[in-house]
Regions:
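Long, charged alpha-helical interface segments
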Residues: 111-113
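Short active-site-adjacent helix-start/loop capping segments
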Residues: 75-77, 106-109
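C-terminal binding/interaction regions
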Residues: 117-118, 126-136
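A glycine-rich helix N-cap at a beta->alpha junction
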Residues: 82-108
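Conserved mixed alpha/beta catalytic, RNA-binding, or beta-rich assembly cores of soluble enzyme
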Residues: 20-80
Length: 137
């Protein structure tokens, strides 16, 4: 996305066709924070949104860490329609997956082998140290 204002008081934007996820100057990768499972208000619409979002993540090569917290951990539950897409992301892009142990416990969700259950303190430190953080909420 490029900002092309015609005057000082006007903002216009030019959208690129392809998704742009820029790395920081030091080559750092993007940290993706998923805080919501999108199923609460409209199941079908929420599932379609999250699957589409995860499908877009699958097409990128610079997601280094995925953090799941709050109801976002519910996408790890058996039978979740997003679990297969998340598995594809893990198999192709190999990001590190951190799950909030408090959230896993609250929602009764098990942490899969490809992820690491960590305390909320570790989650917050990871978020604070992230140079490029994208939040899905």
């Amino acid at each position: 996305m490029k900002n092309n204002p015609e005057t000082k008081s006007e903002l216009t934007f030019e959208l690129e066709e392809e998704l742009e996820m820029e790395r920081s100057a030091d080559g750092g990768q993007v940290t993706l924070l998923i805080k919501h499972d999108y199923f609460s208000s409209d199941n079908e619409h929420g599932r379609a949104l999250l699957k589409s979002f995860l499908g877009t993540v699958l097409d990128t090569q610079n997601v280094g860490t995925i953090i799941l917290t709050d109801s976002g951990v519910k996408i790890l539950a058996d039978g979740s329609p997003c679990l297969a897409v998340l598995n594809d992301i893990i198999n192709i892009n190999m990001p590190r997956v951190l799950c909030c142990s408090d959230s896993l416990s609250f929602y009764g969700t098990a942490c899969p082998d490809f992820a690491e259950a960590v305390s909320s303190r570790v989650i917050f430190i990871e978020i604070m140290e992230s140079v490029n953080l994208i939040t899905a909420e």
